[in-house]
């Protein structure tokens, strides 16, 4: 991994020996350096420290001030309109970040795919897919384990407060919409709309043929006298005429094509990956397009550098506004409080234990300085509750703060922000079992396995939009026959938990980029060598080839001798 600039959150190089010994030595060295710095600290050192870490310090201060300001204003019981006015600076930050998401996803993916050959891209893509799958499955397992051990749903659901309304979506239609959105028929429309199945009713009419006694027409005829036969025939004809005029009408719900507002991130990711691979395969013919998207990406990142100074102000008002919107803080107590605590513990174990452990086992480096370098993006994720809106800040932290290779971040981050949702998968599995517990519904091993698989698959469709977990949770509940209307029991705390699971999602994407970069060092070095070699010129390359052949000949002679 490339070297990093001087910062408060430098990554420690892994020492030799065992993994735990290396981590212990790294922490001891850092403590010793910190002690020496404190002893020799001057006013100039303090000034340089503040200048280097201004973004992080301002953002952390904004969170503290926002929470304090919100609780100070709650006794005044502001109206909904006043709260919206108060939250306006935070809304501006969301709009600024969302403005940059679309060009950033397209430009970064196209340049990332075009800068790598197909073989290297395939290997990196396979590593990314394995990482996404492993971390998501572990997250689901942690969620199921926590809700089973703590058992927050013990008791009756009568004491829980319902809030909002949930739209029921058939599982098959939801997954078909996911696949449809991967291939948008109109790229311009994909920039502001997603395909979403709507439902309509139509009147269906059917004619039912039956006799008065429920038997089929003519079934009761028997061979008797001619008079009786004629009477029977007349009766049957009369019944038949009456029956043919009987028509039953009923309403049927049918799916119809529809749309929902919002960027179709999944479709743009699929198109950008394919487009970038094609440009990369065109070699010098695609250089103009590659340079265009590279310049576009650079321009977007410079805009991010400007907007980032406004981020602390926006985060302050976003967090304060959300706390002021809560009607009753008492909902965090009791049964719902235990549910909230269970989710927090699960997310903390995954984000603070599993992900750093994966980073350490793969790279043999101390993960906590790396996480510290991501603090700006993590706090922004908490404020915006959207991994897609946090994407510009995540790029900046990884590339400029931590020095992760741009070819990796441009490939991994946009895809990860769309399909890698560890926090959402953990939350959906945990919430589904919680709803089963409050309904006194015993789940068997097969149903728990179904929840695990469905939560893993449904998290892919969450697409980084705020509170998407509530929408995809309908799929998880439907898969095991749990009542979808009981999602309203947990909406009261979802705004808070949504921010925590977004932080987990962003951290998972960031650590994934670092892990994939470490595993792809050989491909990256070979790619750099191939890009450098053409600039040397044909005479020099032929000379290198001759020297290489001569050295092979000498090596063969030496081996014979």
UniProtKB/Swiss-Prot annotation:
Na(+) 1 binds at residues 416, 420, 505, 509. The chain crosses the membrane at residues 53-73, 96-116, 130-150, 259-282, 292-319, 341-362, 408-434, 495-516. GO terms for molecular function: glutamate:sodium symporter activity; high-affinity L-glutamate transmembrane transporter activity; L-aspartate transmembrane transporter activity; L-glutamate transmembrane transporter activity; metal ion binding. Na(+) 2 binds at residue 418. It catalyses: K(+)(in) + L-glutamate(out) + 3 Na(+)(out) + H(+)(out) = K(+)(out) + L-glutamate(in) + 3 Na(+)(in) + H(+)(in); K(+)(in) + L-aspartate(out) + 3 Na(+)(out) + H(+)(out) = K(+)(out) + L-aspartate(in) + 3 Na(+)(in) + H(+)(in); D-aspartate(out) + K(+)(in) + 3 Na(+)(out) + H(+)(out) = D-aspartate(in) + K(+)(out) + 3 Na(+)(in) + H(+)(in). Glycans are attached at residues 213, 229, 236. GO terms for biological process: establishment of localization in cell; L-aspartate import across plasma membrane; L-glutamate import across plasma membrane; L-glutamate transmembrane transport; neurotransmitter uptake; regulation of membrane potential. GO terms for cellular component: glutamatergic synapse; Golgi apparatus; intermediate filament cytoskeleton; membrane; plasma membrane; presynaptic membrane. The keyword Transmembrane helix applies. It is a multi-pass membrane protein. Residues 368-398, 448-481 dip into the membrane without crossing it. Homotrimer. Sodium-dependent, high-affinity amino acid transporter that mediates the uptake of L-glutamate and also L-aspartate and D-aspartate. Functions as a symporter that transports one amino acid molecule together with two or three Na(+) ions and one proton, in parallel with the counter-transport of one K(+) ion. Mediates Cl(-) flux that is not coupled to amino acid transport; this avoids the accumulation of negative charges due to aspartate and Na(+) symport. This is Excitatory amino acid transporter 4. It comes from Mus musculus. The lineage of its organism: Eukaryota, Metazoa, Chordata, Craniata, Vertebrata. The gene is Slc1a6.
